[in-house]
Amino acid sequence: MSISRSRFRVRLNNADLSRMSSLLIKILILLGVAAAAVFVLFQLGSSAASFTFEFREDVIDLNILNTVRREANVGNLSDVNLEELSTRELLLTMHSHIDNANTMCNRKIRMGYTGDGGWEICDDPDVRPRVPCIIYSFGISYDFSFDDDAAKLYGCHVYSFDPSMRREKDFYDRSSHVHFYKIGLSGTTYVNQDNKWLLMTFRDIREKLGHTNTTVDIVKMDIESSEWEALPEMVASGELRRVKQLLLEYHLVDQTRDYLLPRLKAIQAVESVGFQKFYVHKNHACTVSSVFPVTRTRCYEVHYLKR
C-alpha cells in the first residue's frame, strides 16, 4: 500500500513565514547582545585594577568660561564704548576678541617657514595679490623666508624693513623683487639716539618709496610692540585704507587699565576702516596667562583682510 507524499507536506502561508522570520531575528539580536555583554565584562574584569575615576584639573571650568562669555566683547569693537569697560572687562575683551576670526578666507597659503616666521596669505580671488603688486614686510631679524616666498609665488615687489640688522647695509636688493631697507616703523619719524635706528611713519615710508597713491597688497608686521605706536598713525593718516591684507603680531606685556585701553582702541581703529580677521594663531613662545579657562598667550599673530 502506498501513501501519497502530499499528505505529509507542511503547507506554510505568508503569515507563518512572517512569524518565523520575526522569531529568527529576535534570536539573533539576543545572541548579539549576550556576546557584547560578555565582551564588556571581560574588558572590565581585565582592567579593573587600573580603572579609577579622578579629578582632572585641566578640565575647562565652566564658571570661568561663562564669565568670559558674559563680560568679554568677542565681536566687532566698532560700536563698543571702551571707556565704560572695567579693567577686568578690558582684559577679557582683549584676549577673547583678538582670538576670534570674524570673516572667511576659503584659501590660505602659508608663506615662509611652517613654524615661527611664516604667515598666512588669503589667496581668495578678490584679495589675491596680482602683478603689479606691492608687499611691505616689517620686522625681518635675518629671516627673509616670508619675503622670498611671496615674491616668488605672486611676482610682487617685496620691501623688507628692519633697523636692528646691524650686519646689513642700509639698503640693498636681495633679489630682483626683494628690497631691504634698514628702517623701522613707528608713530613718528625720528632717529632713536640710543641705538641710532631710523624710524619712520607708514606715510613717510610710502612717500620715500614713491608709493603715495599706490595700493599695498599686503603689510606684514612683527615689530616687537612698536605696532601700538604705528597703527594709530596708519589709521589717522588714512594710509591703512590703501592696504588689502594686514598680517601682524600683537604683543601684550601688561594687564593694567592704562596699558589695555589705548591698545584696544588701536585694534578698534583698525577695524573701523574695514579690516576683519580671517586667521589667528597663538604664539606659544610667549608667556601664557592663566586668567582664562583655555590657553592664552601674550603674542597673537592676527591676519586681517579688507574686502
PLM features per residue range, with description:
Residues 2-307:
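Phosphate/nucleotide-binding beta-alpha loop and adjacent structural elements of enzyme active sites
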